A protein has these predicted regions:
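Histidine-centered active-site/metal-ligand motif
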Residues: 180, 275-277
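Core active-site phosphate/anionic-ligand binding loop and the adjoining beta-turn-alpha structural block
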Residues: 272
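Glycoside hydrolase catalytic-domain groove-lining segments
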Residues: 117, 277-337
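Non-catalytic accessory regions flanking glycosidase/transglycosidase catalytic cores in CAZymes
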Residues: 1-177, 181-255, 262-268, 319-331, ...
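Intrinsic low-complexity, intrinsically disordered segments enriched in polar/basic residues
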Residues: 284, 347-348
Length: 507
């Protein structure tokens, strides 16, 4: 049913002020070192005209991976486009970080590690973080090469990367002990590692950080947890429950709950963190069919509502394990685990991306670390060429227009009307709205209280378009990698938001 929205900006109640670094991103450790990551889709698979064949799971996770050379963090285009996003947290972590050896003296990598980080690679990464005005966050190694499960974790490797980063003028300002400790088997941890071993070692690590790098913020546990995600504090079931899966990827992969990992720890977290994806991509759909959403569901209420529901579910965990009422950080987020859906690099992903940012900010203060900046199909920039994808321009517009004070929009979330309201990012009096029309067929009408600037986003020829239109003009880089002008158009009276359209309205 077509929706009609009447904007009433002068009557809205503020909800909270949010972290100006709400929109941040991941650079996977395996990108820095070079290594395996998710296999790229074919052009036909991205277009939706070719099916993704199920991998041969008898070969393990490697059946879904391919080799990638190290990312060039000195690339001028990469630095320019990342800098345009403004100040962000840059998280260097991921599954591969747990088995990465910091070979800063050039002596080579011993047994028990998997990825090999050279000094110059880390120097380049730190220079990148400084060049883009970012803040550095990492997780550290915790594998057989460092210690066995019955031996306590030791800081011999962590000290190297903390000290080098500080020497380079790019201190590690936030840290998680390890990445996704809910999956203790077959992801890099010492053989036979248990939740009790994790609790022991996390306490050792956190105490060590506080004693030696007291300015560093301690974040954790960086996990997924189906128990936490199934029902929120008000008793509402997860939106995916109707489809037979209460927590998608988390339900299939979480071997330890948040309680298993945290109950009994003596070192309290500064900030509570978790990971969240909208299920799994086509790469893992055959293994986890109930966690996969087909393209036809990418604008459904269940699909779009899952991010805010998950944030509400974790509020009580934040209050228990970190600062009550404090920030929550989603230290990995994206459209789908296992590298993103086939449509992750297209306009269709803009709807989910903007909806997640808007809805998360209505639930809590915090930071969302998008996975990734420039790797795999869910990257904001295309791997290798660093061409900006539609979602890059979408988050760039959010940062340009939406301020850090969040208001209750006064509009119930419903098909055709996902409405979010903030103050203006330019500091001028007024409000900035985002209206997402997640209907496939019906146009949404918006009644304006006065003249406004309109920034209407649509696909360039369809939802799976590789490029996006702003007020009918294609967004792409110009000569010398110049950004396109991101200008609004004046409107008054009423405007229409096309099916699948996302429109920013600045009053």
């Amino acid at each position: 049913m077509a929706q009609h929205i009447k904007l009433t900006p002068d009557t809205l109640n503020p909800l909270r002020s949010i972290n100006p670094m709400l929109i941040s991103y991941n650079v996977e450790t395996t990108e820095i070192t070079g290594g395996t990551f998710w296999k790229a889709y074919t052009d036909a698979q991205i277009d939706g005209t070719e099916q993704v064949p199920p991998p041969d799971f008898s070969k393990g996770m490697g059946a879904m991976h391919q080799w990638y050379d190290p990312i060039d963090t000195t690339n001028p285009r990469l630095i320019k486009l990342a800098k345009e996003l403004g100040s962000c947290w840059v998280r260097v972590s991921g599954t591969w970080a747990t088995r990465t050896y910091y070979d800063f003296d050039g002596t080579g990598m011993p047994e028990g590690y998997f990825n090999h980080l050279r000094k110059q690679q880390w120097v380049n990464l730190c220079n990148f973080v400084k060049a883009v005005g970012g803040k550095l966050k990492i997780s550290v190694a915790n594998c057989d090469g460092l210690h066995s499960h019955d031996e306590p974790w030791n800081p011999s490797q962590a000290k190297l990367i903390f000290d080098l980063s500080r020497e380079l003028g790019c201190p590690i300002e936030a840290v998680e002990f390890v990445n996704e400790p809910n999956m203790l088997q077959n992801t890099g941890f010492p053989k036979d590692y248990t939740a009790a071993d994790f609790r022991r070692d996390q306490d050792i690590f956190h105490k060590w950080v506080r004693e030696n790098y007291p300015e560093c913020t301690i974040v954790g546990p960086s996990d997924t947890d189906p128990n936490a995600m199934s029902v929120d504090a008000d008793g509402n079931p997860h939106p995916w429950a109707a489809g037979g899966d209460t927590a998608g990827i988390a339900a299939a992969l979480a071997y330890c709950s948040t309680g298993d990992l945290m109950d009994g720890c003596t070192e309290k977290l500064d900030i509570f963190s978790y990971h969240y994806y909208n299920g799994v991509s086509e790469r893992m759909a055959a293994m986890m069919p109930s966690a996969f959403t087909p393209f036809e569901g990418c604008m459904s209420e269940a699909y779009l509502g899952a991010a805010a529901h998950t944030a509400r579910c974790f509020l009580s965990y934040r209050d228990k394990y970190a600062a009550p009422g404090g920030e929550m950080w989603v230290t990995e987020s994206g459209d789908a685990g296992a590298g993103g859906h086939t449509w992750a690099s297209t306009y269709a992903e803009v709807i989910r991306t903007l909806n997640e940012i808007g809805s998360f900010a209505t639930v809590t203060d915090g930071v969302i670390f998008h996975n990734t900046l420039a790797s795999s199909d869910y990257g904001w920039l295309k791997h290798g060429s660093f061409d900006p994808r539609p979602s890059y321009f979408a988050v760039l517009l959010w940062k340009k227009l939406m301020g850090n004070t969040v208001f209750d929009s006064g509009e119930a979330i419903r098909t055709g009307a996902h409405v979010f309201c903030h103050d203006r990012a330019d500091g001028k009096a007024g409000k900035a709205y985002l209206v997402i029309n997640n209907s496939w067929t019906d146009t949404t009408t918006v009644e304006l209280p006065k003249e406004a600037e309109i920034y209407a986003l649509t696909g360039n020829g369809g939802m799976r378009s590789r490029t996006m239109l702003l007020n009918g003009i294609e967004l792409k880089l110009g000569e010398g990698d110049a950004l396109p002008e991101l200008n609004g158009v004046a409107a008054k009276g009423t405007i229409e938001v096309a099916p699948g359209g996302c429109t920013f309205i600045v009053l």
